Amino acid sequence: MENVSMNKSRYIPTRDPIFTETMQIGIVVRNLDASLRRYVDDYGIGPWEIHEFTPRDANNLQEYGQSVERSWRLAFTMVGRVMWELIEPLDEESVYARFLAEKGEGVHHIAVATPNFDDTVAEQAKRGNSLVLSGEFSGIKVAYLPTDRDLGMIIEIANGTPVAEENVN
């Protein structure tokens, strides 16, 4: 195991972390309205801010390096210090729609802070990994790293705080 040294029964990194704080959990759902009712009525989670994402809301939206136009509905709320994001795809081809078809509803990605967005993206490219999704939203660059093979989940990084976080709750 490169970059890791054993100390007693713990693994201790020998490099600086590329992920420093969990900011968001992205959950893909089939029906946003039904899911919101379940989250609010059954679990008391909310209030939620709802948005519709259209192709005009992103600059240079790409999936696996290919330019795409996608639409989806989103809802955001804060649970403690972590934003919960519900995502309903409005097309059949997006990474979210494919996730639903293959795995059903559930956690699609975890968004984390990273000390250097560009270096983290470059490191993935050096490993030969195409970004799952990337683009710019409200001036913030976002990238979904293909860490699902290594970590069992997609990691989202951004070069700023999501705009929705400033407006939720």
Where are each of the predicted segments found?
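Conserved short beta-strand elements that form part of the metal-binding/catalytic scaffold
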Residues: 46-98, 140-163
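Extracellular/lumenal glycan-associated surfaces
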Residues: 24, 28-30, 38, 80-85, ...
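Vicinal oxygen chelate
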Residues: 2-16, 27, 29-34, 44-47, 78-83, 85, 90-95, 118-169, ...
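A short alpha-helix capping/helix-coil boundary motif
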Residues: 13-17, 53, 98-101
